[in-house]
Curated annotation (Swiss-Prot):
PANTHER family: GMP REDUCTASE. This is GMP reductase. Belongs to the IMPDH/GMPR family. GuaC type 2 subfamily. It comes from Streptococcus pneumoniae (strain CGSP14). InterPro entries: Aldolase_TIM, GMP_reductase, GuaC_type_2, IMP_DH/GMP_Rdtase_CS, IMP_DH_GMPRt. Pfam families: IMPDH. Catalyzes the irreversible NADPH-dependent deamination of GMP to IMP. It functions in the conversion of nucleobase, nucleoside and nucleotide derivatives of G to A nucleotides, and in maintaining the intracellular balance of A and G nucleotides. The lineage of its organism: Bacteria, Bacillati, Bacillota, Bacilli, Lactobacillales. It catalyses: IMP + NH4(+) + NADP(+) = GMP + NADPH + 2 H(+).
C-alpha cells in the first residue's frame, strides 16, 4: 500500500554526504548506459516542441547525449531517422497509439531507429501494451521506452509487455496542469512515486517531470531513476525552437506543455499551459554545468560514478531548503 511509504518530493529531501574518495570532482564519471549505447549524462531533454527540433536532436547526438525526438512532426519522422543514420548517429523517435501508428512502425523495418518512445499522458493503458507488443514484433532490436505511468502495477505491466524502460511521472512538470484539471497525478510527490515504482522495476526507469534544480538529478538517481527527463531547465536556450518574445526590452522564450492548446492547436482536453522563460545562453553551457554539478554530487556521495548515488542516506526535511517557497 502506498500509504505505508513516506510521501515527499524533491524539495523535501536532502542527501547525506559520505567521505570523498576522489582527488578532483573532474574524476567523477557521469556517463550512463541505456540499451546498447552509453551517454555522457543521465539526462534527456523532454520530447516537446519548445525543447527540441531536428537540429537540437542532432547537436545532442553528436555531443554524446541521449535525446528523444517529439512526435508532433509525424511525416518528418522517417526522413529524420535517415538524416541521423546517414551521419552515423543514433535515431530516437516518439510514437503515439492511434491506429495509423501501427502502419508507421511497420514501415520502419528498412531503417529501424535505435530507440522508440511510446509517448502518451496516461501510459498504463491497453493501447500502450498493444503498441509495445507490435513494436517488439516488428522491430525486435529497437529499445522501447513506454509511458507515462505513476504506479508499480503500471511499471510491471509495461515491462511484462516488452518495454525496455518505463517513464514515470504524471503531471509533475512546470507546464503540466493534469493534477489541477483532473485531480490525478504525481505532482507534489513525484520523487516518492519514483521510489515506489523503482521498488518493483526490473528494467530502467526514466523519471519525467518535476526537476527544478541540478541537485534533483542526483536525488532522482538515489530513488531509482536510470535516466531523468527534464523540460523547463532545457527550455529557453538560444537553440531552443520556442518563439522568442520581447517584453519591456527583455527577451523571453515560450515553453508549453505537450497537451496544451498551443501544441494541440485547439482548446480540447487541455492538460498543459504556456509560460515565458527568460532567454538563456547556449544549450551546451547548461549541459556542461549539469555535468559539473553531477560530478560534485558524486564526490559528495563518496563515489566515482553515477551508480554510487544510489547508496547514500537521506533525510526528509519537508520544504525547509526552500522555506516552503515552491516557486524558488
Amino acid at each position: 500500500m502506498l500509504n505505508e511509504f513516506p510521501i515527499f518530493d524533491y524539495e523535501d529531501i536532502q542527501l547525506i554526504p559520505n567521505k570523498c574518495v576522489i582527488k578532483s570532482r573532474a574524476e567523477a564519471d557521469t556517463s550512463v548506459t541505456l540499451g546498447n549505447h552509453t551517454f555522457k549524462l543521465p539526462v534527456v531533454p523532454a520530447n516537446m516542441q519548445t525543447i527540441l527540433d531536428e537540429n537540437v536532436a542532432e547537436q545532442l547526438a553528436k555531443g554524446g547525449y541521449f535525446y528523444i525526438m517529439h512526435r508532433f512532426d509525424e511525416v518528418g519522422r522517417i526522413p529524420f531517422i535517415k538524416r541521423m543514420h546517414d551521419q552515423g548517429l543514433i535515431a530516437s523517435i516518439s510514437v503515439g497509439v492511434k491506429d495509423y501508428e501501427y502502419d508507421f512502425v511497420s514501415q520502419l523495418k528498412a531503417d529501424a531507429p535505435e530507440y522508440i518512445t511510446i509517448d502518451i499522458a496516461h501510459g498504463h493503458a491497453d493501447s500502450v501494451i498493444s503498441m509495445i507488443q507490435h513494436i517488439k514484433k516488428e522491430l525486435p532490436d529497437t529499445f522501447v521506452i513506454a509511458g507515462n505511468v505513476g504506479t508499480p502495477e503500471a511499471v510491471r505491466e509495461l515491462e511484462n509487455a516488452g518495454a525496455d524502460a518505463t517513464k514515470v511521472g504524471i503531471g509533475p512538470g512546470k507546464v503540466c496542469i493534469t493534477k489541477v484539471k483532473t485531480g490525478f497525478g504525481t505532482g507534489g510527490w513525484q520523487l516518492a512515486a519514483l521510489r515506489w515504482c523503482a521498488k518493483v522495476a526490473r528494467k530502467p526507469i526514466i523519471a519525467d517531470g518535476g526537476i527544478r534544480t541540478h541537485g534533483d538529478i542526483a536525488k532522482s538517481i538515489r530513488f531509482g531513476a536510470s535516466m531523468i527527463m527534464i523540460g523547463s531547465l532545457f527550455a529557453g536556450h538560444i537553440e531552443s525552437p520556442g518563439k522568442t518574445i520581447e517584453v519591456d526590452g527583455e527577451q523571453f522564450k515560450e515553453y508549453y506543455g505537450s497537451a496544451s492548446q498551443y501544441q494541440k492547436g485547439a482548446y480540447k482536453n487541455v492538460e498543459g499551459k504556456r509560460i515565458l522563460l527568460p532567454a538563456k545562453g547556449h544549450l551546451q553551457d547548461t549541459l556542461t554545468e549539469m555535468e559539473q554539478d553531477l560530478q560534485s554530487a558524486i564526490s559528495y556521495a563518496g563515489g566515482r560514478q553515477v551508480a554510487d548515488l544510489k547508496h547514500v542516506d537521506y533525510v526528509i526535511v519537508k520544504n525547509s531548503i526552500w522555506n516552503g517557497d515552491a516557486s524558488h
